[in-house]
């Protein structure tokens, strides 16, 4: 078990109870982080000829399992190595978005006009999670969070797992392609809170429409389609 690199219990409690008072925004924050990861891969594709992805290839997927009481947000973005999981998720309030924006600005400043395809798009890359705390909003609704990630260009996948209290573990995992899955194991329902409602088609679609319409990439989710069945007249 690894320990958070800050006063985790106090700071995590402060973030959950003070910074975020509206529990349902956890999904907005996870989708924002997924959008970050996709942005980073798209940026890499503009400057690295070995990364062949187009904007239309990139997407975010939201899923749920009502029996297991889980909500999953997945992306096919840049992914994270073991060290990056430790750095980005092990340090509360650390954000690599600032570092990414600095690298983005440096690349744009050093490039010649027309040097890289679509380099003008660099100024249009949105970085949402600048403060590095949004991910931890998942612990407002989750008793455990598991992050499975595989970095672009790597054959290895790693899983970061924590209950938000006693530190975290990082272990080898399996993932077919680059990207990240964030699985939130919902807390048990109480007299005041019905966390299980988040693990439903209706609950998630409402939150996506309410909070995440600004995301530039497609947000996919399997939905149940119903149709009227004609009954024969007697």
Please give the residue ranges for each predicted region:
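GHKL (Bergerat-fold) ATPase N-terminal catalytic module, capturing the glycine-rich phosphate-binding loop
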Residues: 1-194, 198, 206
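ATP-binding glycine-rich phosphate-binding loop
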Residues: 129-131, 211-213, 234
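Short, surface-exposed beta-strand/loop "edge" segments at domain boundaries and coil↔beta transitions
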Residues: 153-155, 227-230
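GHKL/Histidine-kinase-like ATPase module
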Residues: 168, 202, 217, 231-234
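Short, cationic low-complexity segments
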Residues: 201-217
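A short amphipathic beta-strand at an alpha->beta junction
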Residues: 215-227
